[in-house]
UniProtKB/Swiss-Prot annotation:
Annotated TM spans: 6-26, 63-83, 89-109
Organism in which the protein naturally occurs: Moorella thermoacetica (strain ATCC 39073 / JCM 9320)
Organism classification: Bacteria, Bacillati, Bacillota, Clostridia, Moorellales
GO molecular function: NADH dehydrogenase (ubiquinone) activity; NADH:ubiquinone reductase (non-electrogenic) activity; quinone binding
Designated name of the protein: NADH-quinone oxidoreductase subunit A
Subunit and interaction comment: NDH-1 is composed of 14 different subunits. Subunits NuoA, H, J, K, L, M, N constitute the membrane sector of the complex.
Length: 120
């Protein structure tokens, strides 16, 4: 019985690896044979010649918000099973979850205090 369950997992792992290898092999077979040159490597701005430098540096702050979102999204993954089994788990699990949420709120407060969540 246990071997059959591991067999299913092995089939999925082999299938996933085969799909990835097939995608990479197809990409390699269909790629252009000669490297691009000339206008293909030039920056494109609506069909016109570029005006000014094409590579400008700008600050992207989305990753900070994405990181905070990911943190609290993972928190909900841990909170949901606990909430479903709340009555069966008892007071000790409630105290553990309060500590878990407290640590996350403390981290959010620290990031906010340090200015990590400022847009610009």
């Amino acid at each position: 019985m246990v071997l059959q369950q591991y067999g299913i997992i092995a089939v999925f792992l082999v299938g996933g690896a085969a799909t990835a290898v097939a995608a990479l092999a197809t990409n390699w077979l269909l790629r252009p044979k000669k490297p691009p040159e000339g206008d293909k490597l030039a920056a494109y701005e609506c069909g016109l010649k570029t005006q000014g430098p094409t590579w400008i540096q700008f600050k992207v702050s989305y990753f900070l918000y994405a990181l905070v979102f990911l943190l609290f999204d993972v928190e909900t993954v841990f909170l949901y099973p606990w909430a479903v089994r709340f009555q069966a788990l008892g007071l000790f699990a409630f105290a553990e979850m309060i500590v878990f949420i407290g640590i996350l709120v403390l981290g959010l407060w620290y990031a906010w205090k340090e200015g990590a969540l400022k847009w610009l």
